[in-house]
């Protein structure tokens, strides 16, 4: 998926939160090209970052981008499915960030041709209501977060309140909604409480 300007808000919020944490581990899940995790690594010299991506072609791009940005000493990539419970061998992360597929399946045919024809469906399709990945990540990946770890999501138009509820139901608190440059609620983040 080609990074969009909206994603800058997500990366900035993550970097701001992690900057005060000192040495930390960050997981960029549904990493796509890896732009969010790589931006974090470039701005946070004490961070170790894992780019987790399901699609093999996107994973190749992640690896190329790690090398191009000369971040091989602090950034790794791994094939991970956000819909499946992670292996305990991954360890714990202080921050989990994700810009998952969030377009409702029925809306994909009506997307602008520049998106519909040039982006992999796998990177767009969030299930019937567009929220499948948010549910899966909150339910299955919360154990990959350290105590008081933080979860950051980019969300689609009109999804922020629903994602907030999903997070709250799964033990996250101090949940914030942040608007993008067009004044649209675009980022939802919170802290693991239990």
Please provide the spans of the model-predicted regions.
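C-terminal beta-strand of the catalytic ATP-binding
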Residues: 102, 191-194
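Glycine/small-residue-rich loop that forms an oxyanion/phosphate-binding "nest" at active or ligand-binding sites
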Residues: 2
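Conserved functional loop/turn residues at catalytic and ligand-binding sites
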Residues: 53, 70, 119, 149, ...
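Conserved Class I SAM-dependent methyltransferase catalytic core
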Residues: 128-191
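Mobile active-site "lid"/loop adjacent to the S-adenosyl-L-methionine
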Residues: 102-132
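Conserved SAM/SAH cofactor-binding pocket of Class I
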Residues: 6-110
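Class I S-adenosylmethionine-dependent transferase superfamily signal
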Residues: 14, 40, 115, 137, ...
């Amino acid at each position: 998926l080609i990074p969009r300007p909206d994603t800058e808000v997500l990366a900035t919020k993550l970097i701001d939160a992690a900057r005060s944490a000192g040495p930390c581990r960050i997981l960029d899940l549904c990493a796509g090209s890896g732009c969010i995790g790589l931006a974090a690594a470039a701005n946070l010299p004490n961070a170790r970052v894992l780019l987790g991506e399901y699609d093999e072609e996107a994973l190749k791009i992640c690896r190329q981008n790690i090398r191009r940005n000369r971040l091989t000493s602090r950034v790794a990539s791994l094939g991970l499915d956000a819909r499946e419970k992670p292996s305990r061998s991954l360890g714990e992360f202080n921050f989990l960030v994700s810009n998952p597929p969030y377009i409702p399946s029925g809306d994909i045919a009506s997307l602008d041709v520049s998106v519909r024809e040039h982006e992999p469906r796998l990177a767009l399709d969030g299930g019937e209501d567009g929220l499948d990945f948010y549910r899966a990540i909150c339910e299955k990946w919360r154990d990959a977060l350290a105590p008081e770890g933080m979860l950051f999501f980019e969300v689609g138009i009109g999804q922020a309140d629903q994602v907030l509820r999903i997070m709250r139901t799964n033990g996250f608190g101090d949940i914030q909604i942040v608007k993008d440059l067009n004044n649209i609620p675009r980022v939802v983040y919170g802290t693991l409480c239990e």
